[in-house]
A protein has these predicted regions:
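Metal-dependent nuclease catalytic cores that hydrolyze phosphodiester bonds in DNA/RNA
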Residues: 1-128
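Mg2+/Mn2+-dependent nuclease catalytic core
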Residues: 114-218
C-alpha cells in the first residue's frame, strides 16, 4: 500500500544503555526512557523476579532474548514498509506471518504517516523515548505502538502499553503543540490469525503516567 507522508520533524536524540536503564541526551539533560520508568515500578520488578525464579534464570534469559530479537526484527520490517513500501525478503516463516498480520490492520486503518521511530522527550515530565508510529488512524491522529507476543493478550493485562503510549502523546504535544489524544496498540500474536488491535483514549491514563514518573524522580 502507498501511504501519504506528512512528516513532522523531530530532533534526533542519543540514547545510552546503563545499569539503571536507558537514558536519552536532550538539550536540557539526560532523561530516562518511559519504558525504563515503567519497568522500575515495584510490582513489575517483583512479578518479573517471580517469573524468573519459577522457570529458572537461564530459561528466562533465553525467552527474553528470543522475544527481543523477534521484536526488533518486526519493528525494523514495519518501519521499512511504512517509509518505503518495501516488504521483507528471506525471513523465517513465523516472522513473515507476524509481519503480514500486522501489515493487514495497518493497511486498513492508517491514512497518513506523521513520524516513524520518532525520538521525543518532555522537559515537564523529565522523560524521553522513541515512538513507533504517529499518524492519522481512522481519521484522527494517534500514537501507534507495535508489540509482539507468543500468546493472545487481554486488555486488562496491557495497561503498561497504554501508559507508555500516553507518555509518548504527552511528549508529542509538548514538542509540537499539536493535539494527539488517541492510542493504538497493535500486537502481532502467534496464537491468533490476525493481529490484535487495542484502542484507547490518552486522557484516561494521564494521571497515572504523571504519578508513576513523579514517583520515579522522587
Amino acid at each position: 500500500m502507498k501511504f501519504t507522508h506528512e512528516l513532522i520533524p523531530f530532533e534526533e536524540l542519543t540514547a545510552t544503555s546503563t545499569s539503571s536503564g536507558r537514558l536519552y541526551e536532550t538539550p536540557r539533560g539526560s532523561y530516562p526512557s518511559i519504558t525504563t520508568i515503567l519497568g522500575k515500578q515495584p510490582d513489575k520488578q517483583k512479578g518479573l523476579q517471580k517469573w524468573r525464579d519459577r522457570i529458572g534464570h537461564e530459561k528466562a534469559d533465553r525467552i527474553a532474548n528470543t522475544a527481543a530479537r523477534r521484536g526488533t526484527n518486526i519493528h525494523e520490517h514495519l518501519e521499512s514498509y511504512l517509509m518505503t513500501e518495501k516488504l521483507p525478503l528471506n525471513e523465517m516463516p513465523t516472522t513473515m506471518a507476524m509481519f503480514s498480520q500486522m501489515k493487514q490492520v495497518i493497511d486498513k486503518n492508517l491514512e497518513i504517516i506523521n513520524a516513524s521511530e520518532a525520538p521525543m522527550y518532555s522537559d515537564t515530565l523529565r522523560v524521553a523515548g522513541r515512538c513507533d508510529l504517529i499518524g492519522i488512524w481512522k481519521g484522527e491522529r494517534a500514537i501507534i505502538d507495535f508489540k509482539t507476543s507468543s500468546r493472545e493478550k487481554q486488555r486488562k493485562y496491557i495497561t503498561d502499553y497504554f501508559l507508555q503510549c500516553t507518555a509518548y502523546s504527552m511528549m508529542f504535544e509538548e514538542r509540537t503543540q499539536l493535539p494527539c489524544k488517541n492510542i493504538v496498540v497493535i500486537i502481532g500474536c502467534d496464537e491468533t490469525p490476525m493481529a490484535q488491535v487495542f484502542e484507547a483514549k490518552r486522557d484516561d491514563y494521564v494521571d497515572d503516567v504523571k504519578r508513576i514518573i513523579n514517583d520515579y524522580h522522587a
